[in-house]
UniProtKB/Swiss-Prot annotation:
Family the UniProt entry places it in: Belongs to the HisA/HisF family.
Catalysis performed (reactions): 1-(5-phospho-beta-D-ribosyl)-5-[(5-phospho-beta-D-ribosylamino)methylideneamino]imidazole-4-carboxamide = 5-[(5-phospho-1-deoxy-D-ribulos-1-ylimino)methylamino]-1-(5-phospho-beta-D-ribosyl)imidazole-4-carboxamide
Cystine bridges: none
InterPro entries: Aldolase_TIM (IPR013785), His_biosynth (IPR006062), HisA_bact_arch (IPR006063), Isoase_HisA-like (IPR044524), Isoase_HisA-like_bact (IPR023016), RibuloseP-bd_barrel (IPR011060)
Protein name stated in the entry: 1-(5-phosphoribosyl)-5-[(5-phosphoribosylamino)methylideneamino] imidazole-4-carboxamide isomerase
Enzyme type, top EC level: isomerase
PANTHER family to which the protein is assigned, alphabetical: 1-(5-PHOSPHORIBOSYL)-5-[(5-PHOSPHORIBOSYLAMINO)METHYLIDENEAMINO] IMIDAZOLE-4-CARBOXAMIDE ISOMERASE
Organism name: Trichlorobacter lovleyi (strain ATCC BAA-1151 / DSM 17278 / SZ)
One CC-aspect GO term: cytoplasm
Chief location bin: cytoplasm
Xref: Pfam families: His_biosynth
Gene Ontology terms: biological process: L-histidine biosynthetic process; L-tryptophan biosynthetic process
């Protein structure tokens, strides 16, 4: 399992939101590229970028910051937020991103995921954000009537590289990930699952490592590495040593 630092972009800054609320944000850096380099130097093998403005607007909004990050780092980066069509996917991949994340559009237009996987094999990730097991879309502003497991199963055979599962009631709240829901999703599908939302201590990392056999291959952490609750280098070292759970 790998630990993946998150860089959430809002108006060109690196921020963290509480429970996905755009008006409950904390700015941690006005230089996202510098921040990205810091996480690379701490040993990160992959960066998780989110265009928050794009997620709410439905179109890319932080292109300059994203380009600057890609130029600054040598490790792979994946990006989500506002990706709703093939043209946007192609444009982002051509910038140098390793993978793109389809979120809202995966629920509203599953055919886009299938087409994107065919056109860009191994480079498409589906982001599933859920509250009480039900999928949330449009930057978490809208709750749907489809379950996270049912949505994930739609993509079982189309070549999705991973599913990022975020429990939005946990995100930015430093309360630990939803282990039960994450494990249930991972066990229901054959696609690798990356856990997100609430990962806020080394113990949380250990708990996720303990369910790695279910298919949980990564943990995204955001607020905790910015506040110092998690030392990223220590977390990465922990996953490399293996769980003693």
């Amino acid at each position: 399992m790998i630990v993946i630092p998150a860089i959430d972009l809002k108006e060109g800054n690196c921020v963290r939101l509480e429970q996905g609320e755009m008006n409950r944000d904390t700015v941690f850096s006005d230089n996202p590229a510098e921040q990205a380099l810091k996480w690379q130097e701490a040993g990160a093998e992959l960066l998780h970028l989110v265009d928050l403005d794009g997620a709410f607007a439905g179109i890319p909004k932080n292109k300059a910051a994203i380009e600057a990050i890609i130029k600054a780092i040598t490790i792979p980066a994946q990006l989500g937020g506002g990706i709703r069509d093939i043209a946007t996917i192609e444009a982002y991949l051509s910038l140098g991103l390793s993978r793109v994340i389809i979120g809202t559009a995966a629920q509203r237009n599953p055919e886009l995921v299938i087409e994107a996987c065919q056109k860009f094999p191994g480079r498409i990730v589906v982001g599933i954000d859920a509250k009480n097991g039900m999928v949330a879309v449009q930057g978490w502003a809208e709750l749907t009537d489809i379950s996270a497991v049912d949505l994930a199963k739609k993509f079982e055979d189309c070549g999705v590289a991973a599913i990022i599962y975020t429990d939005i009631s946990r995100d930015g709240m430093m309360g630990g990930p939803n282990l039960e829901a994450t494990r249930a999703l991972a066990e229901a599908i054959s696609i690798p699952v990356i856990a997100s939302g609430g990962v806020s201590s080394l113990k949380d990392i250990e708990n996720l490592m303990a369910i790695e056999a279910s298919g949980v291959t990564g943990a995204i952490t955001g607020k905790a590495i910015y506040t110092g609750a998690i030392n990223l280098r220590e977390a990465i070292d922990l996953t490399k040593r293996g769980c003693q759970c």
